[in-house]
Regions:
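Transmembrane helix interruption/hinge and helix-loop junction motifs
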Residues: 1-4, 48-56, 111
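Alpha-helical transmembrane segments and their helix-entry boundary regions
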Residues: 32, 55-59
Length: 111
């Protein structure tokens, strides 16, 4: 399980930090934009290497939805977490990464 999680984390970091273009980064928050689908497709393809197809596709779709920022905005509203200024950007980036990593941990546990 730990080995599977570490492989998933490496795939995630490569797809999110090295393979994500400026085009994807700027447009992935809209489900109507192809960049969102291309970005999550890259993640899904990577996850297909280590997870069974159902789990890989589920993790890929979760990545797509998390990157719209709507679940993160909902979380901040429910728990009244609304940092301001430059801290808000950093908080959003790391909140996004934390949620993706939790999803990978769950996927690794059930695989």
């Amino acid at each position: 399980m730990v080995e599977l999680f570490l492989k998933g984390l490496i795939i995630h970091l490569i797809a999110d930090w090295f393979l994500q273009s400026d085009w994807m980064s700027a447009n992935k928050t809209s489900l109507l934009h192809p960049a969102a689908w291309v970005h999550s497709g890259i993640h899904t393809l990577g996850y297909l290497v280590i997870f069974n197809p159902a789990i890989a596709i589920t993790v890929g779709i979760s990545h797509l939805l998390i990157d719209t920022r709507k679940p993160l905005i909902w979380w901040r509203q429910i728990f009244q977490q609304s940092p301001k200024g430059n801290v808000a950007v950093v908080f959003e980036i790391w909140q996004d990464q934390a949620v993706h990593i939790v999803i990978l941990a769950i996927a690794s546990l059930i695989s």
